[in-house]
């Protein structure tokens, strides 16, 4: 995608007779030169370290002890684990993969329908871009000039309400 955008922009500049290699290089460097954008690779690194260290299993163990004993408790565990993972890593895909790898086999062995279990875990993964720290919040804040801390504060209540709604409808 990045190469396609770069080539389209270069073709447009060439067609409009505005092609200057120095301006293009300077724009590329200035676009990526942001202190706030450094948070994104560090979130990914933190997620990899947590996954390698076995923190994902421990994160699932906490909701398991809190609500796992209730009827339908594995569903509640899935949503709570997704919310906890979202508050740590900021990546929806990584959170969903970690929670699904641990909980879908457990839900299958507890005779939950596989499509319903996978749907719940996938729906829980959608909470990750809302609950801070969120990679999409950082990208949106940097590109629009909004305060990232205010975006983070604005995401707490909706993320909690989404999680509560998922647990109520399970």
Residues covered by each model-derived region:
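Alpha-helical transmembrane segments of multi-pass membrane transport proteins
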Residues: 1-170
């Amino acid at each position: 995608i990045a190469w396609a955008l770069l080539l389209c922009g270069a073709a447009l500049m060439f067609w409009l007779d505005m092609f200057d290699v120095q301006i293009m290089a300077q724009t590329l460097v200035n676009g990526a030169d942001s202190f706030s954008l450094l948070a994104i690779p560090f979130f990914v690194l933190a997620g990899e370290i947590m996954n390698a260290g076995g923190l994902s299993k421990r994160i699932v163990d906490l909701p398991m002890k809190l609500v796992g004993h209730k009827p339908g408790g594995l569903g509640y565990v899935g949503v709570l684990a997704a919310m906890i993972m979202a508050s740590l890593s900021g990546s929806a895909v990584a959170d969903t993969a970690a929670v699904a790898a641990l909980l879908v086999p457990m839900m299958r062995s507890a005779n939950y329908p596989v499509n319903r279990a996978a749907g719940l875990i996938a729906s829980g993964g959608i909470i990750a871009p809302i609950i801070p720290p969120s990679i999409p919040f950082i990208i949106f804040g940097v590109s629009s000039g909004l305060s990232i801390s205010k975006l983070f504060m604005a995401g707490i209540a909706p993320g909690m309400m989404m999680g509560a709604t998922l647990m109520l409808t399970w």
